[in-house]
Regions:
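A donor-sugar binding/catalytic signature common to diverse glycosyltransferases
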Residues: 37-61, 65-70, 186-225
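Catalytic donor nucleotide-activated moiety binding site of glycosyltransferases and closely related
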Residues: 1-18, 142-144, 159-184
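Active-site and donor-binding regions of nucleotide-sugar-utilizing enzymes
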Residues: 2-107
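C-terminal amphipathic helix plus adjacent low-complexity
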Residues: 254-284
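A nucleotide-sugar donor-handling region in carbohydrate enzymes
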Residues: 87-154
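Short, well-ordered alpha-helix to beta-strand connector turns
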Residues: 35, 62, 84-86, 110, ...
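Donor nucleotide-activated moiety binding/catalytic core segment of transferases
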Residues: 18-32, 170-203, 207
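Catalytic binding pocket for nucleotide-activated donors in carbohydrate/polymer assembly enzymes
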Residues: 207-260
Length: 284
């Protein structure tokens, strides 16, 4: 686990993280078989750790450096990846108009591009059948963001309290969830619906068949993919007021009672495809 270089003194945090990661990798290379590759999901700073932040010293055994991303607007991470990545893995629905020229630059530098047919959720989740019977009142999981992330500070839209009227709410707000945040996806299918400012949680909930209302200005290629594939995702990207907002909320509330009518595209074999990209053998 590494500290995210955000907020005050983020440059110092980044250098400290780079140095500690390099020292860790150097120690690992001294014990047993040297490390030959690094796989970074979104956190491209670790890809720099194959070389020292202060010296010209490099860990030459680390010849394969993979950068995996599904977030086109994470331009800072993309720019760091261009400095060290040898391979980039992005989804087939990647929207190049949002990535700041990242893929074009990666191709120009000779970085190998792999395109995954599916979302990240297709890799670590399993398709399930959502219960048709809705609780009374409906049980809805709500996740609100702090909005201080690298790329989400201008994406957050305030959700009025009236939105939750008549619902039994499970609060899972960022940094305030009482349970294990890494196991939050297991709670999604246990609820009748999800209301969230988080695009990641929205995608996971929709993939599991839970009707989801995403309230965010975020633009991601996978949001269009989910809607095109028939998943129960309702997106709202403006202020929560007016008749259009009331209609969208009504569509979501009605959607919780219509899960038996959901028809989605077949679940892609993204997990095996990713394993092939990484030259890994799955054990289950």
């Amino acid at each position: 686990w590494v500290e995210r270089p955000i907020g005050e003194k983020k440059r110092r945090k980044a250098i400290t993280r780079w140095r500690s990661s390099h020292q860790f990798l150097a120690e690992c290379c001294k014990v047993g078989q040297p490390i030959s590759r690094i796989i970074a999901v979104g956190a491209s700073l670790e890809l720099l750790a194959w070389r020292s932040p202060f010296l010209k010293k490099t860990l030459r055994s680390i010849s394969h450096r993979y950068y995996i991303s599904d977030t086109e607007v994470n331009h800072i991470a993309h720019n760091l990846a261009l400095k060290s990545a040898t391979h980039v893995i992005i989804p087939s629905h990647w929207d190049g108009s949002l990535d700041g020229g990242f893929i074009e630059q990666a191709q120009a530098k000779g970085i190998k591009i792999h395109r995954l047919d599916g979302l990240h959720g297709h890799v670590h989740l399993s398709p399930g059948i959502h219960a048709n019977k809705v609780s009374n009142p409906p049980k809805v999981l709500v996740r609100l963001l702090k909005g201080d992330g690298i790329h989400d500070d201008d994406e957050v839209i305030e959700i009025p309290e009236l939105t939750f009227d008549g619902l039994e709410i499970t609060s899972a707000n960022e940094d305030q969830y009482d349970g294990d945040a890494w196991l939050l996806d297991r709670q999604l299918a246990k609820h009748d619906g999800v209301i969230t400012q988080s695009v990641t949680l929205a995608s996971e909930a929709a993939l599991l068949g839970t009707p989801t209302l995403l309230i965010s200005k975020a633009k991601r290629g996978f949001l269009g993919r989910l809607q095109d594939d028939g998943y129960p995702l309702f997106c709202w990207n403006k202020s929560c007021d007016g008749d259009d907002w009331k209609n969208k909320l009504a569509q979501f509330l009605a959607g919780m009672h219509l899960t038996d009518a959901i028809e989605t595209e077949p679940w892609p074999n993204a997990r095996n495809q990713l394993a092939e990209f990484l030259s890994m053998q799955l054990i289950d």
